[in-house]
From Swiss-Prot:
Sequence positions that bind (S)-2,3,4,5-tetrahydrodipicolinate: 153, 162-163
Active-site feature positions: 152 (proton donor/acceptor), 156 (proton donor)
SUPFAM superfamilies: Glyceraldehyde-3-phosphate dehydrogenase-like, C-terminal domain, NAD(P)-binding Rossmann-fold domains
Chain residues that bind NAD(+): 7-12, 96-98, 122-125
One Pfam family it belongs to: DapB_C
Classification lineage: Bacteria, Bacillati, Bacillota, Bacilli, Bacillales
A single GO molecular function term of this UniProt record: oxidoreductase activity, acting on CH or CH2 groups, NAD or NADP as acceptor
Coiled-coil region(s): none
Family of this protein: Belongs to the DapB family.
Keyword vocabulary terms for this entry: Amino-acid biosynthesis, Cytoplasm, Diaminopimelate biosynthesis, Lysine biosynthesis, NAD, NADP, Oxidoreductase
Protein name, entry field: 4-hydroxy-tetrahydrodipicolinate reductase
PANTHER family per record: 4-HYDROXY-TETRAHYDRODIPICOLINATE REDUCTASE 1, CHLOROPLASTIC-RELATED, DIHYDRODIPICOLINATE REDUCTASE
Name of the gene this protein is made from: dapB
A GO-annotated cellular component: cytosol
């Protein structure tokens, strides 16, 4: 498959480039940066042996290169518009950018189905993180008192993380509604109890040195349960990205969540 990478200078995008180069059945045909200084990726020392054009305009890249799939790891500010542009050009998309609303996902799914092309948006591409979310969903049926703590590097722009929100959404499907905390609790400092989703609390931590981590803490009388996943290196996401790229060939719709393509 001929693959282009949008946001290739970001930490995740950079790792995606290396992953595409490693995979025998994937070919890197173009990269995109919002303000490129280079015309070819070989102007970067790490990729000096390659011949891959660098673009600053997404539509121009799609029309000139005509890739089979674009992998997008950019920012919440442009993630939706990028994905819409990719799909409207009839190109498959794998998107790790977060911050999509349910309405945006629905609209993008409609475009994908009208073009009969596959696309996948996932808050997290680490298989371990997907399992963590599935375990939490199952536990929430029996432990409705639960809070989420998600921890990421301090350059992450959105909070809560897509993984935190997706976990809460999945737990809400099986969990009896409980408004977490005392009915008359008072925040001495606004925001101390975190964000609220369907009665659950989500807390976001941003610190240098972190990559992507999350724990889901359940409490009940006389017992507690903690489910935690840690990504220590961004390579933990790459097997999921490669799988998703290949899977788009089999799809004619947009899938939200890596768990929906795992056997």
């Amino acid at each position: 498959m001929r693959v282009a990478v949008s946001g290739f200078k970001g930490r995740m995008g950079h790792e995606v480039v290396k992953t595409v180069l490693r995979e025998a059945d994937l070919e890197l045909v173009a990269v995109l940066d919002h303000e490129p200084k280079e015309k070819n990726i070989n102007e970067m020392v790490e990729f000096s042996s390659l011949d891959v054009p660098v673009f600053g305009n997404l539509s121009e890249m799609l029309e000139e290169i005509k890739p089979d799939c674009v992998v997008d790891f950019t920012t919440p500010k442009v993630g939706y518009s990028n994905t819409k542009t990719i799909l409207e050009h009839g190109v498959r998309a794998v998107v790790g950018t977060t911050g999509f609303t349910p309405e945006q996902i629905s609209e993008l799914r409609t475009i994908a189905e009208s073009k009969k092309i596959g696309a996948l948006i996932a808050p997290n591409f680490a298989v371990g993180a997907v399992l963590m979310m599935q375990f939490a969903q199952k536990a929430a049926k029996y432990f409705p008192n639960v809070e989420i703590i998600e921890l990421h590097h301090d350059n992450k722009l959105d909070a809560p993380s897509g993984t935190g929100v997706k976990t809460a959404e999945m737990m809400a499907e099986t969990r009896e509604f409980v408004k977490q905390g005392a009915a008359d609790e008072v925040e001495l400092i606004e925001g101390a109890r975190g964000a609220e989703y369907e009665g659950m609390r989500i807390h976001s931590v941003r610190l240098p040195g972190l990559v992507a981590h999350q724990e889901v803490i359940f409490g009940a009388e006389g017992q507690g349960l903690t489910i935690r996943h840690d990504s220590y290196d961004r390579i933990s996401f790459m097997s999921g990205v490669a799988l998703s790229v290949r899977k788009t060939k089999e799809l004619e719709t947009l899938i939200y969540g890596l768990e929906n393509i795992l056997d």
